[in-house]
């Protein structure tokens, strides 16, 4: 069987294409059911975040056409997808999974959210019955290495994430965040982090809007803000200098008209907006308005780079941990291969011995002389055990394979007793 990692991320595909390839939780469940029926797929998991969509699969020797499957499932042409799709196999696939889980392949180097997202992908696949053996074990290796990266390197010493980058970007736009009012849309982990970072910057006011107002109020209370429902967005928007949105809505929740009306009420005081969501929460046309500065996750790269330098050394240490893990994995796989050979050898020899033993027992039951029966049993068993190795060794000798003969001596003979 073969491990395959295939997908797109923020370095290969722009936000528009990543939107097309994003899977909601419900869509991921449908996709996993489809993968379960795909010929050649033994085990599989699907990871879908703002910045990447990836499949991790254990396949038969012939790798299925995942590009075709992904293109069909998202109504894209294979030609368009093939220009941005990457695929890793074997140890390279495992190393890629470790780099992703450790935050080394993220838009924000070392960001911690990706490990939780990968654990969720693992749990979904397990619940769908698509993790039942080797891939499940490989995921545990990945999680173990990712945990070591978090605890043994300084990659998480300075909190950096897409959420932090969004707030950092706002600091570049506004001279003093203490005089700014912020409106956050959503109530997931990303918005929780944004709220925390804004609170640390002592922003004047934080309002959190969510489909479930109770959840919004709960998050807002932790940072001294207030929670509202999505129905209250138009009014709240009139007060917002900073708007950061990250929901799981399949369609935009804020259009150009809503923002135009808010700007009129604000007497066209500028608004800074960051749309972290994929698919996007804010219609792209909003960015055409003269008093709006709209950014997506793809625009955050410059702000993110400020904190990347401090993590480069930690990233090198993390890469060393991954390389060590791959070496251990390779050694364990080789040991497992040896165990399989020994198991097969033992079963084969056991079958031979049982066959000869049954013959000997039958001879004893028929009144045969015990000593003669045992000697014949010994002679016959040794001959049967040595027949196949003898044929192979003669052929090796005839072919001039001296190294193989030395290896055979090492395997077959105990020199201490020779």
Curated annotation (Swiss-Prot):
Q: Which residues form the active site?
A: 50
State which pathway it belongs to: Porphyrin-containing compound metabolism; protoporphyrin-IX biosynthesis; 5-aminolevulinate from L-glutamyl-tRNA(Glu): step 1/2
User: What InterPro entries does the record point to?
Assistant: 4pyrrol_synth_GluRdtase (IPR000343), 4pyrrol_synth_GluRdtase_dimer (IPR015896), 4pyrrol_synth_GluRdtase_N (IPR015895), GluRdtase_CS (IPR018214), GluRdtase_dimer_dom_sf (IPR036453), GluRdtase_N_sf (IPR036343), NAD(P)-bd_dom_sf (IPR036291), Shikm_DH/Glu-tRNA_Rdtase (IPR006151)
Is Secreted found in the keyword set? Answer: no
Task: Name the chain's protein.
Answer: Glutamyl-tRNA reductase
Q: What is its EC number?
A: 1.2.1.70
> Per its UniProt record, what CDD domains does this chain match?
NAD_bind_Glutamyl_tRNA_reduct
Q: Regarding domains, what does the record say?
A: Possesses an unusual extended V-shaped dimeric structure with each monomer consisting of three distinct domains arranged along a curved 'spinal' alpha-helix. The N-terminal catalytic domain specifically recognizes the glutamate moiety of the substrate. The second domain is the NADPH-binding domain, and the third C-terminal domain is responsible for dimerization.
């Amino acid at each position: 069987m073969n491990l395959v990692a295939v997908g797109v991320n923020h370095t290969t595909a722009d936000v528009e294409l990543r939107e097309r390839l994003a899977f909601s939780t419900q869509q991921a469940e449908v996709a996993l059911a489809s993968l379960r029926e795909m010929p050649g797929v033994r085990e599989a998991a699907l990871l879908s975040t703002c910045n990447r969509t990836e499949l991790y699969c254990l396949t038969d020797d012939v790798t299925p056409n995942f590009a075709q499957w992904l293109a069909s499932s998202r109504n894209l042409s294979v030609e368009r997808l093939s220009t941005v799709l990457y695929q890793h196999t074997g140890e390279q696939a495992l190393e890629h999974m470790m780099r992703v889980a450790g935050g080394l392949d993220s838009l924000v180097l070392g960001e911690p959210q990706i490990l939780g997202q990968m654990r969720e992908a693992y749990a979904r696949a397990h619940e769908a019955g698509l993790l039942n053996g080797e891939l499940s074990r490989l995921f545990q290796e990945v999680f173990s290495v990712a945990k070591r990266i978090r605890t043994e390197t300084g990659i998480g010493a300075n909190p950096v994430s897409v959420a932090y980058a969004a707030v950092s970007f706002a600091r570049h736009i506004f001279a003093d965040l203490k005089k700014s009012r912020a409106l956050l849309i959503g109530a997931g982990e990303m918005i929780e982090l944004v709220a925390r970072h804004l609170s640390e910057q002592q922003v004047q006011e934080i309002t959190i809007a969510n489909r479930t107002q109770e959840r919004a109020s709960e998050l807002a209370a932790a940072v001294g803000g207030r929670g509202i429902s999505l129905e209250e967005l138009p009014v709240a928007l009139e007060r917002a200098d900073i708007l950061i949105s990250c929901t799981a809505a399949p369609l935009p929740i804020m259009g150009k008209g809503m923002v135009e009306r808010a700007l009129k009420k604000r007497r066209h005081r500028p608004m800074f907006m960051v749309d972290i969501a994929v698919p996007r929460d804010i219609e792209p046309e909003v960015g055409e308005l003269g008093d709006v500065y709209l950014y997506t996750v793809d625009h955050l790269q410059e702000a993110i780079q400020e904190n990347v330098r401090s993590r480069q050394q930690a990233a090198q240490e993390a890469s060393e941990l991954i390389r060590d893990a791959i070496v251990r994995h390779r050694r364990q796989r080789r040991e497992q291969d040896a165990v399989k050979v020994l198991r097969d050898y033992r079963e084969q020899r056991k079958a031979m011995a049982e066959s000869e033993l049954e013959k000997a027992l039958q001879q004893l039951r028929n009144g045969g002389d015990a000593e003669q029966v045992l000697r014949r049993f010994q002679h016959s068993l040794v001959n049967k055990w040595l027949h196949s190795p003898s044929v192979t060794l003669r052929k090796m000798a005839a072919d001039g394979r001296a190294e193989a003969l030395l290896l055979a001596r090492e395997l077959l003979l105990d020199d201490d007793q020779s």
